[in-house]
Amino acid sequence: FSAWQKKSYYKTSDTFCTLGLLVGNMVVVVATKGLTLAFHIYLYQFKIFDIASMVPLWMMWLMAFILIDLVFYIYHRMSHRVSFLWAIHMSHHSSEEMNFAVSFRQAWFGPISKIPFFMILPLIGLDPTIVAVAGSISTLWGIVGHTQIINKLGPLEIFLNTPSHHRVHHGANKQYIDKNYGNLLIIWDKMFGTFEPCLLYTSPSPRD
């Protein structure tokens, strides 16, 4: 689509680098996904709240999407602030481009680094299967955010982490550094003081 628009959003060398990271990441995902789900099912036995008996199924799903996003916000913010986690996450910010391919530029050990954060979800009583499915769906929205093709999305900008909001997160402009950590929702950034609207042209840049 970008080629049809005659936009230079992709570079061959950059995309091949992304593919290399993606292969390693997927190997780890395949190796750990089942184990992580089994671990969550085990933890679910010790749940603090029996949410399934307290709310209807649709509300359990809604809670899963919201709480997954909150935990991701915390994980993502710490990945920019804690040296060990940044060493894992920084590969995602190593591109000078902003395109769909960058969404797949994921660290090999990223899936493992998330485990200590997301284990809280089954412990508070969220069904592990629902958490797994809702998490996968949320990840798909995260892919959509890595593009320059989509401009602003009207009223959705108020509560969703839209592509324009996520371009800020990848921007090299000083006021954009370490902003907009949300994945599905932008409300956490607004609540916790890390929100920055997209007012200037964002220039993606690799970070040390």
How would you name each of these model-derived features?
Residues F1-F16:
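Membrane-interface helix-loop junction between the first two transmembrane segments
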Residues V23-T32, V55-L200:
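Membrane-embedded catalytic scaffold of the fatty acid hydroxylase/desaturase
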Residues Y201-D208:
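Conserved small/polar residues in nucleotide/adenosyl-binding loops
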Residues A31-P56:
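Long, highly hydrophobic alpha-helical transmembrane signal-anchor segments
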Residues L19:
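Residue-level signal for inorganic ion chemistry
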Residues T15, I41, A107-W108, I187, ...:
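Short, low-complexity, polar/charged sequence segments that are solvent-exposed and flexible
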